[in-house]
Amino acid sequence: MTGVPSSTWFSAAPHWEWLIALYFFLGGLAGGSYFLSALIDLFGSREHRPLAHLGYYVAFPCLALSGLLLAVDLGRPLRAWHMFIQSNTYRPMFKYWSPMSIGSWALAILGFFAFLSFLAALAEDGRIRWSGLRRLRAPSPAGRIIAVLGGFFGFYVAGYTGVLLAVTNRPIWSDTPLLGLLFIVSAASTSSALMILLAYRSGRTTPVVADLHRMDDWVIALELLVLIAVMVSLGPVLSAWLNVWGILLAIVIVLGMIAPLVLSWRARRFHQVTLATPALLVLVGGFLLRVVIVFSAQSV
C-alpha cells in the first residue's frame, strides 16, 4: 500500500449515480423540515404555527419522492417491498445490524408521521374540511405525540445518509467519523433555507421568518466548521479532492456558505427587505455538497 493514503483505495465503488445524490438531498430536506416544524409546534408560539405548516408541506412530498428515487435506483422498483417484508414468510424484515435496513424503516415511519402532519396542516389552512384532522397537531395530546416521535425520526433521517456512507468502505466516506454530523447540520441549513423561500413566496414574511434567518446563519457557520473538521480528519485522504471535485467543493464553500452569510449580514445591516438570495444559494450549495461527497469517493 505504499503511496496510498488509505486501504479504502482498494475497495470497489457502489456505482451510485445522480438518483442517489438527489435522494440524499431530498431525504435531508424531508427530515430537517419535519424536525424543525416539530420543534416549532412543541416549543413555538401561536404566531410560529404558519411557518411550521411550510415544513410539513415540504416533508411529506420530499419523503415520497426520495422513496421513489431509492426504489428506482434499485433497478427493480416493484420489488422494493422486499426491504420491509420477507418474500417467503411475508413477515416484517428488520436487520438491526444494517444501516440500509434501519434507514429504510426510518424513512417509512417518518413518512407515516409526515403524512399525518401534512393532513393536519392542510386542515388548519382550510384546504381540507375535516376539523378532526387539526387534532393531529400540537398542542393537542395526539399532536404532541406525533411531533415528538416524528421529530425524532426526522432528526435520524436527516443524518442517516451520512452514517450510511461512513460504513461503506470507500475513500472519504469511511475515513472520517463526521459525515453523519455534517449531513445533519447541512439538512438543518437547507431545510431552513427552503422554508424561508416558501415563506416569501406565500407572503408569510413575519418576524418569525427573520428569526429563522438568524438561526440559519448560525447553522451555516456551524456547517462550515464541521466541513473544515471533516477535511482535517481525512488527513492524507484529503488528496482525493485535489481535482475537479475539490474545485466544486471550494465553490460550495464560497457560494453555498460564505456568500449567504455575507449577503444575510448586508441585508440586515442595510435593512433590505428580502433575504431570498442567500436562502437559494444555501439550497444549491447543499445539493452540490452531496454531489461532491457521493461522486468524489467513487472516482478514486
Tell me what each language-model feature is.
Residues 277-296:
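Final/C-terminal transmembrane alpha-helix of multipass membrane proteins
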Residues 5-13, 83-93, 130-136:
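Inter-helical loop and helix-membrane interface segments of multi-pass membrane transporters/permeases
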Residues 17, 24-26, 43-46, 98, ...:
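Long, contiguous internal "core" modules enriched in hydrophobic/ aromatic residues
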Residues 66-69, 260, 285-286:
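Alpha-helical transmembrane segments of multi-pass membrane proteins
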Residues 1-42, 291, 295-299:
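N-terminal signal-anchor module of multipass membrane proteins
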